[in-house]
Amino acid sequence: MQTLAENLTSQAISPTLEKLILTLANTSKEISHAVRHGALAGVLGATEQENVQGETQKKLDIITNDMLKDALKADGTVRGIASEEEDYVVEADANGEFLVCFDPLDGSSNIDINSLVGTIFSVLPAPAGELTEKSFLQAGHNQVAAGYVLYGPSTMLALTTGQGVQLFTLNPETNQFLLTNAAMAVSKDTGEFAINMSNQRFWEAPMQTYISDLLLGKIGPREKSFNMRWIAAMVGDVHRVLCRGGIFTYPTDNKNPEKPYKLRLMYEANPMAFLVEQAGGKASTGYETIMDIEPTAIHQRVAVILGSANEVDACLEYHGIDYSEEPAL
């Protein structure tokens, strides 16, 4: 089996991007070790701190954030860092070519119950000049790499550099990521959907109607039975979509009118959209393609609908948009 390093060389990407991806991968091995040790290392439970989103930070949120931040600052290829756990952007190397946005431990509320968690990352080109928040405000189409590491029964890395999506599995005996799927592909159709049903009464009318029709199954307008899945960690739900198709959505809701969206654009929606589109799926807010969004803040939130192309199209029809037709040239 090809190692991650061998695979990156075969992709003919720049040596600096290759170095950065290997740094992210190597740090994820350390995070995997910390996650596995859990209560044995005294790293479970919450702190008394909150992040910029007002969410209570788990001990491992802070530990994993510091691990990634320290590794990227020392890498030499990174100009700046944006993290879910940092209020502001963090400067790294003044000569760095890249900006890295990451969620160090997605699904951290699952940690204390020994369920799935992961790391999500996005790599952008660093513009010339002084590093500010504005440096990061680039549309998702500018990403040069994106991926996630899933800490489950196996530790897996899903990666794209714009040349499809490759899946690597960490060999615990050699501590190397080995290529186990050279071309992940999202099926066009699906019979599975993932959504937090407890928020149903707060959704917009198009999403309410769409989900209601799925639940009606064969006796409804879709004339097909669907199963619901929900892991409560985006990284786990998107991994399932990449492996066997499906649609994952965290839609607009009015539960808190000041925060109508849950997921963050820069380090959750954009990297996952890049992966899903590279695997043949689609990713939208319901009203626009996620990677077309021009960001206004590093912690900006958006609605997310992504997964199997035909099912995303079906959902978008409920929102009054038909993306199934290719634009005329």
From Swiss-Prot:
Annotated GO molecular function terms are: fructose 1,6-bisphosphate 1-phosphatase activity; magnesium ion binding
Q: In which pathway does it act?
A: Carbohydrate biosynthesis; gluconeogenesis
Keywords tagged on the record: Carbohydrate metabolism, Cytoplasm, Hydrolase, Magnesium, Metal-binding
Binding positions (Mg(2+) 2): 103, 106, 268
TM segment ranges: none
Q: Which InterPro entries match?
A: FBPase_C_dom (IPR044015), FBPase_class-1 (IPR000146), FBPase_N (IPR033391), FBPtase (IPR028343)
- Protein name, UniProt field: Fructose-1,6-bisphosphatase class 1
Q: Which residues bind substrate?
A: 106-109, 196, 262
Which metal ions or organic cofactors does this protein require, according to UniProt? Mg(2+)
Return the Gene3D superfamilies for the record: 3.40.190.80, Fructose-1,6-Bisphosphatase, subunit A, domain 1
User: Where does this polypeptide localize?
Assistant: Cytoplasm
| Reactions listed under catalytic activity | beta-D-fructose 1,6-bisphosphate + H2O = beta-D-fructose 6-phosphate + phosphate
Give the signal peptide as a residue range, or say none if absent: none
**GO BP terms in the entry:** fructose 1,6-bisphosphate metabolic process; fructose 6-phosphate metabolic process; fructose metabolic process; gluconeogenesis; sucrose biosynthetic process
Q: What is its EC number?
A: 3.1.3.11
Could you name the Gene Ontology cellular component terms for this entry?
Answer: cytosol
Q: Which HAMAP family match?
A: FBPase_class1 (MF_01855)
Looking up CDD domains in the UniProt record yields: FBPase
Cofactor, how bound (note): Binds 2 magnesium ions per subunit.
Q: Which family does it belong to?
A: Belongs to the FBPase class 1 family.
Please name the PANTHER family in this protein's record: FRUCTOSE-1,6-BISPHOSPHATASE-RELATED, SEDOHEPTULOSE-1,7-BISPHOSPHATASE, CHLOROPLASTIC
**Binding, Mg(2+) 1:** 84, 103, 105
Description of how the protein assembles with itself and partners: Homotetramer.
The protein's predominant localisation is cytoplasm
